[in-house]
Amino acid sequence: MAPKKKLQLPPPPTDEEEYWDSQAEEVLDEEEEDMMEDWESLDEEASEVEEVSDETPSPSVAFPSPAPQKSATGSSMATTSAPQAPPALPVRRPNRRWDTTGTRAAHTAPAAAAAAATAAATQKQRRPDSKTLTKPKKSTAAAAAGGGALRLAPNEPVSTRELRNRIFPTLYAIFQQSRGQEQELKIKNRSLRSLTRSCLYHKSEDQLRRTLEDAEALFSKYCALTLKD
């Protein structure tokens, strides 16, 4: 605002009424001037504000964004975007009834037996791979049944070996005939057991020949007993 002008009082007039009238006119003139100056300053400020508003771009009116509406479409979109978990299956408790458990055990028993048999077969196949092997024990009857040849020392004479190979089949035949017989037969007070020992331990050809003759006689005696029965 423009600075106010200092009032310069004129010299007092001679007439008092003229003095007061002139004072009132001066006061009114000053007030009018002050009002005009105020209005001019207001007009200048308004024009400056308009110029500034014309130069700066008008800001876009930002409208408040609407609140998210909970609708059926929104819920469907949420469900489609999120992966659906598989439905939980009901836990089935085992049936403890005696009739069902018995039938299940009967059905599973053959499968368990087959599994045990296969495991035993594989274990038997793996046994030869072990370092320590046990030799099977061969009985005299099995040796006689395996072709009638007795395996003895390699330095044994051929004659005694042939006699032993003839005695053992005869002893095996006596063993077959004596099965089921209540009475044990003997020949010259010699039974099947004594003839078997003689065949195993005698080394002379004469002893083995007499053992062969006694074995044949005992075999014929058992055959005659079975024919009578």
Swiss-Prot record:
Miscellaneous comment as given in the Swiss-Prot or TrEMBL entry: All late proteins expressed from the major late promoter are produced by alternative splicing and alternative polyadenylation of the same gene giving rise to non-overlapping ORFs. Expression of packaging protein 2 and splicing factor is controlled by a L4 promoter distinct from the major late promoter.
Residue numbers spanned by region RS-repeat: 178-198
Region (Disordered): 1-157
Primary residence: host cell
Domain observations: The tiny Arg-Ser repeat region (RS repeat) is necessary for the splicing enhancer function.
Induction: Expressed in the late phase of the viral replicative cycle.
Gene Ontology biological process: mRNA processing; regulation of RNA splicing; viral DNA genome packaging; viral genome packaging
Stretches the record annotates as Necessary for nuclear subcellular location: 172-199
Effect of residue 198 to G: No effect on nuclear subcellular location. No effect on splicing enhancer activity
Family: Belongs to the adenoviridae splicing factor family.
Superkingdom field: Viruses
One Gene Ontology cellular component: host cell nucleus
Transferase keyword on record: no
Its biological purpose: Promotes alternative splicing of late transcripts by promoting splicing at weak 3' splice sites. Required for the temporal activation of major late pre-mRNA splicing at late times of infection. Induces the splicing and expression of the late capsid vertex protein.
Protein name from the UniProt record: Protein 33K
Signal sequence interval, chain numbering: none
Sequence ranges of Low complexity compositional bias: 55-64, 71-82, 100-122
Source organism of the structure: Human adenovirus C serotype 5 (HAdV-5)
Post-translational modification comment from the UniProt entry: Phosphorylated in vitro by human PKA and PRKDC. PRKDC inhibits, whereas PKA activates the splicing factor.
Keyword terms of this UniProt record: Host nucleus, Host-virus interaction, Late protein, mRNA processing, Phosphoprotein, Viral capsid assembly, Viral genome packaging, Viral release from host cell
Entry's localization field: Host nucleus
Subunit structure: Homooligomer. Interacts with DBP; this interaction occurs at a unique vertex during genome packaging. Interacts with IVa2; this interaction occurs at a unique vertex during genome packaging and seems to potentiate IVa2 and 33K oligomerization.
Sections of the chain in a coiled coil: none
Biased composition (Acidic residues): 14-54
